[in-house]
């Protein structure tokens, strides 16, 4: 990809508020889609960029549809295909959030996350976290779990699908129906001291700090600078 200078981390649900547990209770959950599903998109994007040094973060969280829509107007269908709705009277987390992340190497990441937003789910994501990377030699995005490389071949723009799953081109993973089982194996081996984690605790902390900074920036209206 060359020098990756721009990226997008996205996890959008047009209507997909989790109605079980404490997801819509800020006192117990801490936040809404940003901390629930946005974290997966950001984690994937940072990992693919292999860049974790942040300059500053600015962002906004929105509390619009979660409290605005009465149950009969929510139009939400759960994963089993049944009509489902949330209680808009007790909903007190954001329903969507956006963040702008400036890295110390000059690269920029735009993060979008939503449980409820009047925007069609794009890029064929099929209710998944996906990433888009833009570099000087080519670009890469993840489409329904596949990696799509756009580059130049024989002086012509070309699109190449890389493996049948994003995990297929990450060292240590193999293409298959359940890459999550590989994640479990790697985690257990790391606990036993038999191998290393792909994502370190320090890298995971950067993800958490970015999300917290988006919430802080939304509250204060100011960017949050990292050390």
Show where each model-derived region lies.
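C-terminal hydrophobic helical "lid"/dimerization subdomain
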Residues: 204-218
């Amino acid at each position: 990809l060359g020098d990756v200078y721009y990226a997008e981390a996205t996890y959008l649900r047009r209507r997909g508020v989790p109605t079980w547990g404490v997801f819509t209770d800020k006192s117990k959950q801490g936040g809404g889609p940003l901390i629930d599903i946005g974290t997966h998109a950001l984690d994937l994007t940072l990992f693919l960029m292999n860049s974790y040094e942040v300059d500053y973060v600015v962002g906004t969280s929105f509390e619009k549809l979660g409290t605005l829509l009465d149950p009969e107007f929510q139009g939400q269908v759960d994963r089993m295909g049944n009509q489902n709705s949330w209680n808009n009277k007790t909903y007190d987390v954001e329903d969507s959030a956006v963040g702008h992340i400036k890295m110390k190497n000059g690269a920029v990441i735009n993060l979008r996350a939503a449980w409820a937003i009047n925007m069609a789910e794009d890029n064929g994501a099929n209710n998944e976290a996906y990433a888009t990377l833009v570099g000087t030699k080519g670009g890469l995005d993840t489409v329904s779990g596949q990696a799509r490389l756009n580059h130049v071949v024989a002086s012509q723009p070309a699109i190449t699908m890389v493996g049948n799953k994003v995990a297929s081109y990450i060292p240590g993973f193999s293409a298959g129906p359940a890459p999550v089982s590989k994640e479990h194996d790697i985690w257990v081996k790391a606990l036993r001291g038999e191998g290393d984690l792909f994502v370190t605790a320090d890298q995971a902390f950067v993800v958490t700090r970015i999300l917290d900074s988006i919430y802080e920036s939304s509250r204060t209206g100011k960017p949050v600078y990292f050390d």
